[in-house]
Amino acid sequence: NYRSWRMAEIVRLCEQMGVPKPIVCQPYYNAMNRMPEVEVLPACQHYGLGVVPYSPLARGVLTGKYDPKVKPGKGTRAGRGDQRIMETEFRKESLIMAQKIKVHAEKRGMSAGVFATLWVLNNKIVTSVLAGPRTVAHWNGYLEALDYEFSPEDEALIDKLVAMGHPSTPGYSDPQ
């Protein structure tokens, strides 16, 4: 989780010291958080770093399991009051967006989670995703994304919901 200027400085210092530079960057990147597209992903491409984003499902929000009109279930991160999700992804705008993605994905015959993973993997700069399944079913959902092709209509949907380089909520900044 480094800003692009820090990545450049790390690469410069590694070259100066004659040691291997980093080989991968793990940004927080998904369809609700497109901020890395502005500087981080281009820096990775420039310096030849692999990109393995974490939280492609936005801590589960992009699965569409949270209805913005319904209190989250007790067995969910939001239902347990998990601080990370409550301070980040669990915002009305994101929940509404996730429901729109869910409807679109289901029309294509896939789950919203598969769609969200596929969206991240569709970025040519991305090497892989850092998956965090809690169950075998979750793991299979990540793998299922490899069975689909991303369409121009899919990309247009995400571009309509979240502008390139921005988060799902205008002016939002992840409190890392």
Region annotations inferred by a language model:
Residues G109-T117:
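Short catalytic/ligand-gating loop segments at beta-alpha or beta-beta junctions
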Residues P36-T76, S111:
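Aromatic-lined glycan-binding groove of carbohydrate-active enzymes
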Residues N1-M35, E39, G50:
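Glycine/proline-rich, positively charged
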Residues C25, C44, V51-Y54, I101, ...:
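Conserved, mostly hydrophobic/aromatic
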Residues C14-K21, K107-G109, E149-F150:
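Short helix-capping segments at alpha-helix termini
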Residues N1, Q26, A116, L130-A131:
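Short beta-strand segments
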Residues H46, K74-V103, K107, N122-T127, ...:
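Terminal-tail/helix-coil boundary detector
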Residues R3, Y29-N33, S55-L62, W119, ...:
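Glycine-rich beta-alpha junction loops
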